[in-house]
Amino acid sequence: IRPSNQGSSIGVSILKAVDIMTYRDSINAAFFIEHVSSPVWNAYSKEEKYIWAVEVSDIRGGIGFPVELAEQTIHHPQALVKYLDNYLITNDSCTIEGHMTEQRVIVESFIDGREFSCIVLRNEDQNAVALPPTEIVNSGDIYDYRSKYLPGLSRKITPIAVSDDHLQAIRSECERLYDYLGFHTYARIDGFINAEGKIFLNAPNTPSGMLPSSFFFHQAAEIGLNPSQFLSFIIRCSVPERLKD
């Protein structure tokens, strides 16, 4: 269950069992809505209230600030705590919504497989070329924002440890999607391969992260390019694309 416009790592939940309460909470999370009841709030200590408000304000796991309440827009955790302290004296519960809330959510089946990410380039001959894909081994069920950027929460293995046939199949499918969507210069395509070798491509991305630990540079190293060489190649291939515009 995830928002329709936030990619694959913000507001995402996995429903592991038939549980209406968990389902409701997951839908609310995807809509960036938070409910808090008076009994729960008033049982918190002052420190716990502030910690809760900070967590709600963090878009990576909460709903993000500013938040909308019945009477006003709030921009800071301390202001939210003060508001709830007053509001929940005379009210049973409070509904908090993110300022930029979603209008739709996506409910989709969980793909049980090995997750990968593949950089695809448009070379100087205008052919799509997929680099050796990277497998993402997560400590949890979702490769979310924290797993991407906090050390120790995921491992990256380049290339993904599958048979040569499956490796080539992944690259071919990524190249096919790259051409179908009309990408230019380069893109990152994420997906899964299951135990039967079926490939699911679920997240095409026009840009790719360029941190030192990013797939972008891992995969370039597999074909013998250091970061400077790879960026020079990207720039050289980008210039003709911009001239077309």
Show where each model-derived region lies.
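Short, mixed charged/polar active-site loops
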Residues: S9, E115, N127-A128, I199
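Active-site nucleotide/adenylate-binding loops and adjacent lid/helix of ATP-dependent enzymes
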Residues: I1-I106, D112, E124
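A long amphipathic alpha-helix within ATP-dependent nucleotide-binding catalytic cores
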Residues: A79-I111, E115, Y149-N194
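ATP-dependent carboxylate activation and anion-phosphoryl transfer catalytic cores
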Residues: S163-D245
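Short beta-strand scaffold segments in enzyme catalytic cores
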Residues: F116-V120
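Short acidic-glycine loop/turn motifs at beta-strand connectors
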Residues: R122-N127, N194-G197
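Short small-residue beta-strand/loop micro-motif enriched in glycine and branched aliphatics
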Residues: S8-S9, R155-I157, L211-F216
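Mobile, glycine-enriched helix-loop/loop "lid" segments at the mouths of ligand-binding/catalytic clefts
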Residues: Y23-S38, Q126-L150
